[in-house]
Curated annotation (Swiss-Prot):
Keywords: ATP-binding, Cytoplasm, Glycolysis, Kinase, Nucleotide-binding, Transferase
The gene coding this protein: pgk
Organism of this sequence: Rippkaea orientalis (strain PCC 8801 / RF-1) (Cyanothece sp. (strain PCC 8801))
Main location: cytoplasm
EC category: transferase
Protein name: Phosphoglycerate kinase
Subunit-structure text: Monomer.
Positions with a binding annotation for substrate: 24-26, 39, 62-65, 121, 154
A Gene Ontology biological process term: glycolytic process
Catalytic activity: (2R)-3-phosphoglycerate + ATP = (2R)-3-phospho-glyceroyl phosphate + ADP
Pathway where this protein functions: Carbohydrate degradation; glycolysis; pyruvate from D-glyceraldehyde 3-phosphate: step 2/5
Record-level GO cellular component terms: cytosol
Length: 400
């Protein structure tokens, strides 16, 4: 499934045209100050490309969860200010995303100018994918570009609805890169392919583990979910997090890995804590020596060595989810070691894909984000794509 992208649009296709671009400007704010503008910068290649080709660029995004009401603190004005600084040109801030005032503002745009529509989620119809709202949103544009991978797994008016009223409908550079890396890793990986799955719960990663067991050569499991696997093996896990209703599933996943010939690696030692706190007392033990009253919050140093050895010959790696409670420095060593290992492997030619969510925060915290082949910008969207699901926002785009 190859989707049309902005690369397929010539200057003649877009010059003088009104191009509606769905971006993800859901950035963290402290008052009116943007504390991290990564998502704004990530959209710049698509925006600049359209400016250079002489389009009238109309950007739309959600911000926070205003639940269909106008919430003053969730207006996109600070985003327009920052975007204007990054582009080095003015950005017209609209007072709504549909209606006469928006139409008037867009009609004033010259070729190569940019307007930002107000928060889409001030209208409940956005998340409901209301056709009438989608039609109003599309009425001010000629064609559509989706560059918001983080919301591609949702069928909203701005991600799916508008495509029924505009043509062509294409992917921006960000979505194109996501599809190139994530789909290639699943459908046609360079082998050996190793998947590293972490996080606290097996339940949230069942789909991705099951899909990757069909695709990968080795599967490394870390994070809180390891204790469900240990308990399923009959080991004592103390006060560690366990999903008792997933013990049979854990057994079946291990059995499936064996049946498929996939190396299934669980930690051999863990770092225990006497309570869930950054200053808890800690000790490292073998997995068969976990005592009552203690909980595992990280993988141990022996496990790190075993995992590093398993990763040494890999050509592709997908990492989703931390190895421990990396927010606490005392229990971040496992996650940090894996991040550094992947950074080194990238330097040797391995394709390293950080599949969204907490693993992205982890590689950023360690300072090796720029050393990975690809960092996915979507949390839920990355997981669903890795699970092999169809994402509505991608399915709605034109085929090549």
């Amino acid at each position: 499934m190859t989707k049309k992208s902005i690369v397929n649009l010539s200057p003649a296709d877009v010059a003088g045209k009104r191009v509606l671009v769905r971006v993800d400007f859901n950035v963290p704010l402290d008052g009116a100050t943007i504390t991290d503008d990564t998502r704004i910068r990530a959209a710049l290649p698509t925006i600049k490309d359209l400016i250079e080709k002489g389009a009238k660029v109309i950007l739309c995004s959600h911000f926070g969860r205003p639940k269909g009401q106008v919430v003053e603190s969730m207006r996109l004005t600070p985003v327009a200010t920052r975007l204007s600084e990054l582009l080095g040109q003015p950005v017209v801030m609209c007072d709504d995303c549909i209606g006469d005032s928006v139409t008037a503002a867009i009609n004033q745009l010259q070729n190569g100018q940019v307007a930002l529509l107000e928060n889409l989620r001030f209208h409940a119809e956005e998340e409901a994918n209301d056709p009438e709202f989608a039609q109003k949103l599309a009425a001010n544009a000629d064609l559509y570009v989706n560059d918001a991978f983080g919301t591609a797994h949702r069928a909203h008016a701005s991600t799916e609805g508008v495509t029924h009223y505009l043509s062509p409908n294409v992917a921006g550079y960000l979505i194109e890169k996501e599809l190139n890396y994530l789909q290639a890793a699943i459908e046609n990986p360079q082998r050996p392919l190793v998947a590293i799955i972490g996080g606290s719960k097996v339940s949230s990663k069942i789909g991705v583990i099951e899909t990757l067991l069909e695709k990968c050569d080795k599967l490394i499991i870390g994070g809180g979910m390891i204790f469900t696997f240990y308990k399923a093996r009959g080991l004592n896990v103390g006060k560690s997090l366990v999903e008792d209703d997933k013990l049979e599933l854990a057994k079946s996943l291990e059995a499936k890995a064996k049946e498929k010939g996939v190396d299934f690696l669980l930690p051999t030692d863990v770092v225990l804590a006497d309570n869930f706190a950054p200053d808890a007392n800690a000790k490292t033990v073998s997995i068969d020596a976990i005592e009552d009253g203690w909980m595992g919050l990280d993988i141990g140093p022996e496990s790190v060595k075993v995992f590093q050895a398993a990763l040494a010959d890999c050509k592709s790696v997908i990492w989703n989810g931390p190895m421990g409670v990396f927010e606490f420095d005392k229990f971040a060593k496992g996650t940090e070691a894996i991040a550094h290992t992947l950074a080194e492997l990238t330097g040797k030619g391995t394709i390293t894909i950080i599949g969204g969510g907490d693993s992205v925060a982890a590689v950023e915290k360690v300072g090796v984000a720029d050393k990975m082949s690809h960092i996915s910008t979507g949390g839920g969207a990355s997981l669903e794509l890795l699970e092999g699901k169809v994402l509505p926002g991608i399915a709605a785009l034109d085929e090549v």
